[in-house]
Amino acid sequence: MAKHFSTLQHDVWLPYKFAVGPVFQRFYEGLKEEKILGNRCPQCNKILVPARSFCPKCNVDMDEWVEVSQEGEIVTWMVAHEPFFGMPVEPPFIGALIRLDGTDCDLLHLVGGIDLSSPDTIAKKVKKGTRVKAVWRAEKEGHMLDIQYFMPM
Amino acid sequence: MGREVAIIGSGQTKHGRRNDLTYPDLVREAVQAALRNTGITLDDVDGVVSGTMPSMMEGVAFTHFYFADALGSVGKPIMKTETCGTTGMSLAQTGYYWVASGMADMVLVVGSEKMHEGDSQATMSTVLEPFYLRPFLTGAPGVFSMQGQQWTATYNIPEEKTREAAAKISVDHHRDALDNPYAHIQLDLSMDDVKNARLISYPVRLWDVCPNSDGACAVVFASAEKAKKICAKPAWVKGLGFCGDEYWYGDSNKVAWACAMEAARQAYDMAGITNPRRELDVAEIYNPFTFVELLHYECFGFSEPGRACDDTLAGAYARDGELPCDPSGGVLCTNPIGATALIRVAEAALQVSGQAGDHQIDGAKLALAHGLGGVSQFNGIMIVGSEG
């Protein structure tokens, strides 16, 4: 019989308070009004979303705000089948990169509003290039999940 | 360019579920194995480099204190390096820089992880900030599944072909691991076992995914003068590269993946390699997921873009192929994360010094070791050769 080796249980619980900063604060206020806000880089002219304080490529401040389209195309996707620690959404769910119309980077979010019971039925409806639009929750908290998901059109 | 640097030996623990000993004792097991392999003593070591995953994996934040006695670092300078999955490669490169700079002649480099003590996927989720990326990425499988899907969609590779190639990689590596005494998961699987396994995150199934492993690895880096004096067959560091992506996950293309290609370019330039598929004899790719290994064949210039599945199915990267990849079984069979990329370096060095045992690639003279980490954010490479 294999020898039993004992272990000792120890849990770590640590609270944190993250500073939001003025740019994300405005972005979250936009979500409460059902607006998706990005900003335009004055150097490369790209529109990046979510809004951020500076362009990562050009390393210059971005002060010009743009309300971007709530429709776009799926760039890539996966279906989460296993629950993960601290996740706000129960599996199965579809995580995806979405290129909103007129923007120059991909937004990470969920695709939903379709039958998620089988990967094969999902693969018929969700592909690279599938058009999707934002579906909003009735109650807003100023959080990315104020957009419940992006639904295939 | 700094001084010439060699790897004079290494040690690994038996990887797997190791609740038979404490974490520091696991670290010591690798250190002692490296001392036996090289014939040196701790008195010969000028400095120690140590690293793990982020502290949430360990449950102890200050690991170089926790491991101080096990590492033999008391009374010596110690450096800690941590870059998530790339940690082991960053450790190796830290050791290399230290010796190349001339500030040390012999450096002990140690990576470790005891993944069964914590919750690896919970730790992986804390690698992401909680408000934008974390809710959508489900630890590592979500990230790599999306990257794999993006790759197949970019080149219109039929799903059946990708599935077949990924299954072959899984079957081959789980069998390769049977010849590696340190490997964690050693299995004889069929193609159907892999293709019909439980879904983790579509399209990734159970045998496409690496395990949680407990394990440690120690590698000794030395100056040319020391290496020639005490080691019959050193593995000479011929090239290295490291490159990272931005934080924002949707900002860059992860298929024609700039940071992987750039890391390889840096390493090939330094090593004088122009045709990696022909010139390299063996590669230890950081392959926590089958699809990730396929993608890297293209990023590293082994296969033309969109052709990795065809080349894999033709056997190019199998043990008896043109460029054997992960003959140790790779990350897919053994993943104590803080040690994992350092194991790639140790395995590459074993191959070019003819010490890889039952998974030795005959006559291997030039080998590539790879580390991948962050949220698909970092790539690092070290190339080692039998000739100084």
Where are these regions (language model features)?
Chain B
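Beta-strand segments within the central parallel beta-sheet cores of soluble alpha/beta enzyme folds
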Residues: I7, L42-T52, P77-T83, V107-G111, ...
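Conserved active-site "lid/cap" helical segment
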Residues: M1-T86, T94, W151-A165, H184-S190, ...
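Extended C-terminal subregions enriched in glycine
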Residues: W257-M261, R265-F291, C299-F302, L332-I337
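Short glycine/threonine-rich loop-to-helix capping motif typified by GTGT followed
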Residues: S55-T63, Y249-N253, Y286-D310, G338, ...
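Conserved catalytic cysteine-centered active-site region
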Residues: G2-R3, R18, P54-V110, K114-F144, ...
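C-terminal amphipathic "assembly/sorting" segment characterized by alternating charged
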Residues: G338-G388
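Active-site-proximal alpha-helical scaffold in enzymes
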Residues: E82-E113, P141-D179, V219-E225, C333-A356
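Condensing-enzyme catalytic core mediating Claisen C-C bond formation in acyl metabolism
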Residues: M1-P24, A33, P130, T154, ...
